[in-house]
């Protein structure tokens, strides 16, 4: 290595003398002189690279503000649910993933408005169109109007932290799911059990109302049948 370096320096000095250059390198200063000569180029190159990167970011931001291009989606970033959602056990996250895949009818990794509508209907808590949109907007970090798995997990994080309004659709979803997201030991388990009992009571009342409507329709049909029979009997008396 030392021999090659020395040969290179001697070759450079001979070349400079042949060209009539007067800048003779002094022993011991060769490295410093070379560094000084190359430093401006490297600095300019670094500054140019930084300027290009900044310009690209500013142009992208301007495009996004004008509605051109797509913003980088947090939900599409590769993430590890077990490290990002440490408040949940592996079993809890597996249960959430199973539920998410169950209602991801399109198998595209998202739950869209219609799939969320079907989910809430199957859970026994149908929502209005505006209600469904509001549910998505509450955790829709990338504003794509659908739920990624990460955003789906955010629902249960907010539920466990008590950050959801009790009358909100997301609170109902978390409450009616079969996933226990309690993180407060016995107290959390007690609250979860009470919430499940309340959900069962709501479901029972809903079933009772349906049964009452069915009984009312049967009663009305029977009355119509009896009136028709009485009318026919009355007709027969005049024959």
From Swiss-Prot:
Function: May regulate B-cell receptor (BCR)-induced immature and primary B-cell apoptosis. Plays a role as negative regulator of the canonical NF-kappa-B-activating branch. Controls spontaneous apoptosis through the regulation of BCL2L1 abundance.
Localization annotation: Membrane raft
Protein name, as recorded: EF-hand domain-containing protein D2
Residues that bear N6-acetyllysine: 232
Stored PROSITE patterns: EF_HAND_2
Composition bias, Low complexity: 32-46
Source species taxonomy: Eukaryota, Metazoa, Chordata, Craniata, Vertebrata
Pfam families: AIF-1 (PF21008)
Residues engaged in binding Ca(2+) 1: 104, 108, 115
Record-annotated EF-hand domain positions: 91-126, 127-162
Organism: Rattus norvegicus (Rat)
InterPro entries according to UniProt: AIF-1_EF_pair (IPR049025), EF-hand-dom_pair (IPR011992), EF_hand_dom (IPR002048), EFHD1/2 (IPR040365)
Keywords: Acetylation, Calcium, Membrane, Metal-binding, Phosphoprotein, Repeat
Region span, Disordered: 1-51
GO cellular component: membrane raft
Residue positions binding Ca(2+) 2: 140, 142, 144, 146, 151
Residue list for modification Phosphoserine: 11, 73, 75
Major localization listed first in the record, in broad terms: membrane
Residue positions, PTM Phosphotyrosine: 82
GO molecular function: calcium ion binding
Modified residues (N-acetylalanine): 2
